[in-house]
């Protein structure tokens, strides 16, 4: 059950991260979940574990990390021309 909650929180974090940057996260809900998980990992590495926690995620660093991930992915996947 805690794994399912972690996935739901990761989806929400990925979605919140995508709200802060211009560009779309490809892959829909799965892409948002992956951005949330990777973003939480990056946010933890860069910013630590301060702020409120939910399901093992430090929310503020995770959302900032997810915004970074969404921004980078949107740069890499945008169509040129």
From Swiss-Prot:
GO cellular component, one term: plasma membrane
Keyword Nuclease: no
Protein's membrane topology: Multi-pass membrane protein
Main location: membrane
Disulphide bridges, residue numbers: none
Residues annotated as transmembrane: 1-21, 27-47, 56-76
Family note: Belongs to the UPF0410 family.
Name assigned to this protein: UPF0410 protein YwzA
Native source organism of the sequence: Bacillus subtilis (strain 168)
Upper taxonomic lineage: Bacteria, Bacillati, Bacillota, Bacilli, Bacillales
């Amino acid at each position: 059950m805690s794994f399912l909650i972690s996935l739901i929180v990761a989806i929400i974090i990925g979605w919140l991260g995508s709200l802060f940057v211009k560009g779309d996260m490809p892959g829909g809900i799965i892409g948002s979940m992956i951005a949330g998980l990777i973003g939480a990992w990056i946010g933890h590495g860069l910013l630590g574990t301060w702020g409120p926690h939910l399901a093992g995620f430090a929310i503020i660093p995770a959302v900032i990390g997810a915004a970074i991930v969404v921004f980078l992915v949107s740069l890499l996947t945008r169509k040129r021309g």
